Amino acid sequence: MVNFNQFLKQAQSMQKKMQEAQEQMANARYTGKAGGGLVEVIATGKGEVEKITIDESLLKPEEKEMLEDLIKVAFNDAKQKCDEDSQNSLSGALNGMSLPPGFKMPF
């Protein structure tokens, strides 16, 4: 039989750890690169683009399509790093939490 008070303390501890992990993610910055660094995108932990840097060699009308592709790739690279870090942070917040049999988290 699971002690309800112990479970409640664990849940409160997990909630605090998850809140801390979310705050860390909100303050984190991720840099995605494409074209060997010709395009860089810096995104926040919330997935918002903060800055885009484009090498001047790509600022030619005939390079427009390639530039668009590189921006997309750089953004996706930054987002992937953000997603991986988010997953690791939340996994760490849940570490050590034992749930009663049959209890499932809402995610």
From Swiss-Prot:
InterPro entries recorded: YbaB-like_sf, YbaB/EbfC
GO terms, molecular function: DNA binding
Compartments in which it is found: Cytoplasm, Nucleoid
GO cellular component, one term: bacterial nucleoid
Keyword Transferase attached: no
Domain of life: Bacteria
Function field: Binds to DNA and alters its conformation. May be involved in regulation of gene expression, nucleoid organization and DNA protection.
Similarity field: Belongs to the YbaB/EbfC family.
Record HAMAP family: DNA_YbaB_EbfC
PANTHER family the record matches: NUCLEOID-ASSOCIATED PROTEIN YBAB
Subunit description: Homodimer.
Full protein name: Nucleoid-associated protein RF_1365
Organism whose genome encodes this protein: Rickettsia felis (strain ATCC VR-1525 / URRWXCal2)
